């Protein structure tokens, strides 16, 4: 019986240590979420403005530009998948990978060859385990992205988009990331970056009315200059939203783990007390039985 009590004490001690770790990770994630949300909010005005500028140039001028031209028969697509480097974030990476698989299946059914670009070690492990290749991998800083990484990814994707499909280029670029809605809601999301879906002036609502610009030297050169900046800004915004979503998921996962640890400690404590009570009862029973035996003798 004493050995059983020692086992329960060891379990209580180890679970208590784990609970402290979970609590520390929860507090770290909580403290970083605020900054991550602020970065998402700060990136939105620029991303929206450059998208509107590109739409304005394209809708107000009859320009046959690779940025907005829909290929007649697209045969190749690039898919950028944003996951996390670390675990302990609930179903965050699993959800975005499930969304990516749905997109890959749809593109395959449309007869398109797909080049996969991967961000985060979780997605890397997912594809490596299944023996499925990917075009390029980026790891590190998934929970604290930097603009330089977005520019690097954007440069690779733009080069692929501007390259002829016969030479390994692509006709479309899609991004799969986690959209940060609130601390309790994050949605896996798919966005087609290129070709850009332009809002035509006739179809624009009062809120979507596009501004009029004059371009020097001409609108086509403006689009050439905007293409890499547009891609970079959209990718960076997606990375920031993914980072905020990862931290929110980790905070919830660590809180849940801490609550479960507390529940386990209560259960082990109850079992230990029951075992101690049974041990005391057994000892008393043996003492009484021994005393009775002495008296009867």
From Swiss-Prot:
Main location: membrane
One Gene Ontology CC term in the entry: plasma membrane
GO MF terms, alphabetically ordered: ATP binding; proton-transporting ATP synthase activity, rotational mechanism
Subcellular localization(s) per the UniProt record: Cell membrane
A Pfam family reported for this protein in Swiss-Prot or TrEMBL: ATP-synt
Example GO BP: proton motive force-driven plasma membrane ATP synthesis
Assembly description: F-type ATPases have 2 components, CF(1) - the catalytic core - and CF(0) - the membrane proton channel. CF(1) has five subunits: alpha(3), beta(3), gamma(1), delta(1), epsilon(1). CF(0) has three main subunits: a, b and c.
Name used for this protein in its record: ATP synthase gamma chain
């Amino acid at each position: 019986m004493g050995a059983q009590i020692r086992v329960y004490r060891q379990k209580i001690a180890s679970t208590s240590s784990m609970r402290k770790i979970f609590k520390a990770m929860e507090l770290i994630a909580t403290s970083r979420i605020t900054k991550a949300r602020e970065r998402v909010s700060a990136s939105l005005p620029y991303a929206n403005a450059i998208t509107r500028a590109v739409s304005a140039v394209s809708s107000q001028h009859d320009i046959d530009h690779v940025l907005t031209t829909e290929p007649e028969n697209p045969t190749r697509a690039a898919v950028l998948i944003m996951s996390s480097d670390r675990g302990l974030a609930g179903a965050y990476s699993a959800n975005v990978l499930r969304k990516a698989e749905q997109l890959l299946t749809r593109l395959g059914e449309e007869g398109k060859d797909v080049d996969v670009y991967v961000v985060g070690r979780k997605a890397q492990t997912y594809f490596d385990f299944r023996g499925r290749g990917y075009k390029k991998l980026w790891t590190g800083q998934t929970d604290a992205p930097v603009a330089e990484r977005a520019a690097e990814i954007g440069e690779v994707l733009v080069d692929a988009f501007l390259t002829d499909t016969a030479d390994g280029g692509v006709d479309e670029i899609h991004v799969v990331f986690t959209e940060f809605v609130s601390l309790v809601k994050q949605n896996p999301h798919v966005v087609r970056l290129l070709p850009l879906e332009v809002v035509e002036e006739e179809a624009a609502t009062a809120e979507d009315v596009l501004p009029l610009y004059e371009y020097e030297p001409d609108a086509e050169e403006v689009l050439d200059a905007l293409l890499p900046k547009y891609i970079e800004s959209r990718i960076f915004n997606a990375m920031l939203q993914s980072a905020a979503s990862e931290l929110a998921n980790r905070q919830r996962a660590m809180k849940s783990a801490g609550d479960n640890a507390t529940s386990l400690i209560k259960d082990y404590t109850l079992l230990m007390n029951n075992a101690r009570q049974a041990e005391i009862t057994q000892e008393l029973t043996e003492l009484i039985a021994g005393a009775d035996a002495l008296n009867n003798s």
